Swiss-Prot record:
Assembly description: NDH-1 is composed of 14 different subunits. Subunits NuoA, H, J, K, L, M, N constitute the membrane sector of the complex.
Gene Ontology annotations of biological process type: ATP synthesis coupled electron transport
PANTHER family: NADH DEHYDROGENASE
Membrane-spanning segments: 3-23, 30-50, 67-87, 96-116, 120-140, 154-174, 202-222, 247-267, 271-291, 299-319, 332-352, 375-395, 411-431, 453-473
Topological type in the membrane: Multi-pass membrane protein
Reactions this protein catalyses: a quinone + NADH + 5 H(+)(in) = a quinol + NAD(+) + 4 H(+)(out)
Family affiliation: Belongs to the complex I subunit 2 family.
Record-given protein name: NADH-quinone oxidoreductase subunit N
HAMAP family (alphabetical): NDH1_NuoN_1 (MF_00445)
Record's GO cellular component terms: plasma membrane
Organism of derivation: Dehalococcoides mccartyi (strain ATCC BAA-2100 / JCM 16839 / KCTC 5957 / BAV1)
Length: 485
């Protein structure tokens, strides 16, 4: 039970937030502090169990290993920073702040479960727990754009969930097992003369599973929801979807495909080719469609699709050469680098848009002259997302490119490099508007100390992970070595 203490603490904190909300009539800012206190306790519980030997729990449904612990810390940290960035923004909700923070915590619980699951049934349940919380959070503004985004996300999410379930059912029908380890054992004990890649139902199950998970990470061609949902959602939730939800989807993606579908190699290379094609489409489409955007949240929505493509490059490297650790390490490092870079960008946008009243890129004209701190922070984030040294985004792309080359995917590395150049067009357009244009009016950006602290922490992380990444790389290497099934 001690090993599940972080999840228990998060669940109790969500309940306490809802109960406390009933007794607060004026300022509800304390709900954010209560949520942060619970997240701090969950983080401490995770660290205390960090060196515990890996084990399976609840009949092999959950893995308590280094991989799960790494994502626990990552998701808890990201959720804490999102809550800090929400303190000012949630004044728009007034009566529903308790529900807002509780749903953020429940989404966190679902994402932690996604990284820990080793069973097809709990995999689906954890996905839906996080998904249901996000469906509500997306529509929290209750205006036309927010409601439209929530409905679109709900309907397309339902279709994706149906495809995922169908895929998991086909995998179960082939193996007769729901536990990932048992499915792997079944595949390994098949007659030596049997070509598993010729089993149409099983391959279809893998394709449908990729489809369902592809929706969760906004990978092409399952990305249709992302730009509209990102634009219409409350900005902190756009941030949460962009970083934490995407990371959770890839955490599940890697555990499932690395632990089950990398043996035999022919099967591994089969799905790796599919992933490589999706990566190519995602990088190209996301970057090209981001160029003409005038709304910065929508632009970052297309950018997020492109970054999902970069992460799929690492996943393709895992599939093509599963014996190499570089693919797994580069995938996790990219998730962290993208998360902290996107955090800086969106936290800056929350502060700026609250003062200007607009998310349109032209409203950022001359921002460097009126608010140099926030302009510098947003510039830092955009440079990191582009892949400029010595920032975290540069090393992340370097590791991705290196993993692709070592996995004999040179063509995919070239595609990724070309797309990196294309992405500079729209990132530098925003930088140009902020630094080279004259301000339309004198607007001072005001923000609370929690938002400033979130901006400072994430900005510092972008610099530290780019200049001295050794500690993070060591944690990631240990986490990927301890994936059990």
């Amino acid at each position: 039970m001690d090993l599940f203490m972080p999840e228990i603490i998060i669940l109790i904190t969500a309940l306490l937030v809802i109960i406390t909300d009933l007794f607060l009539t004026k300022s509800k800012r304390h709900l954010a502090y209560l949520s942060l206190l619970g997240l701090g306790a969950a983080a401490v519980a995770t660290v205390l169990n960090w060196d515990s030997p890996p084990e399976l729990a609840f009949g092999g449904m959950w893995a308590l290993d280094g991989y799960a612990s790494f994502f626990r810390i990552l998701f808890i940290s990201l959720s804490g920073l999102v809550i800090m960035a929400s303190v000012d923004y949630v004044n728009k909700f007034r009566r529903f702040q308790g529900e807002y923070y509780a749903l953020v915590l429940l989404a966190l619980l679902g994402m932690i479960m996604m990284a820990s699951t080793t069973n097809l049934i709990t995999m689906y349940l954890s996905l839906e727990l996080a998904g249901l919380a996000f469906y509500v959070l997306v529509g929290f503004l209750k205006d036309q754009h927010s409601s439209e985004s929530a409905l679109k996300y709900l309907l397309l999410g339902g279709v994706a969930s149906a495809m995922l379930v169908f895929g998991l059912v086909l995998i179960y029908g082939f193996s007769g097992e729901t536990n990932l380890g048992s499915i792997l054992n079944y595949i390994q004990t098949l007659p030596s003369g049997m070509d598993i890649t010729a089993h149409t139902g099983f391959i279809l199950g893998i394709i449908l599973t990729i489809t369902g998970l592809g929706f969760k990470v906004a990978a092409v061609p399952f990305q249709f929801w992302a730009p509209d949902v990102y634009q219409g959602s409350p900005t902190p939730i756009t941030l949460y979807l962009s970083i934490a939800s995407k990371a959770a989807g890839f955490a599940l993606f890697l555990r499932l495909f690395y632990t089950v579908f990398t043996d035999p190699l022919a099967l591994s290379q089969e799905w790796a080719l599919i992933v490589a094609v999706l990566a190519t489409a995602g990088m190209t489409l996301g970057n090209v469609l981001a160029i003409p955007q005038k709304n910065i949240k929508r632009m970052l929505g297309y950018s997020s699709i492109a970054h999902a493509g970069y992460i799929l490059v690492a996943l393709a490297a895992v599939g093509n050469s599963p014996e190499l650790a570089d693919g797994r390490i580069s995938l996790l490092f990219y998730l962290v680098a993208f998360a902290v870079s996107d955090l800086v960008a969106f936290v800056s946008i929350i502060a700026i848009s609250r003062s200007t009243g607009s998310d349109e890129i032209p409203s950022y004209e001359g921002l460097a002259k009126t608010n140099p701190v926030y302009a510098s922070a947003l510039t830092l984030a955009l440079l990191s997302l582009t892949g400029f040294p010595p920032l975290a985004g540069f090393l992340a792309k370097y590791y991705i490119f290196s993993a692709a080359v070592q996995a004999d995917l040179l063509w995919l590395m070239i595609v990724a490099a070309v797309n990196t150049v294309i992405s500079a067009v729209f990132y530098f357009n925003v930088i140009r508007v902020m630094w080279l244009r004259q301000p339309r009016e004198e607007v001072r950006v005001l923000a609370s100390w929690p938002l400033k602290l979130a901006l400072g922490i994430s900005g510092l992380a972008v610099l530290i992970f780019g200049i001295i990444p050794e500690t993070l790389l060591n944690l990631i290497e240990k986490a990927t070595e301890l994936i059990i099934h």
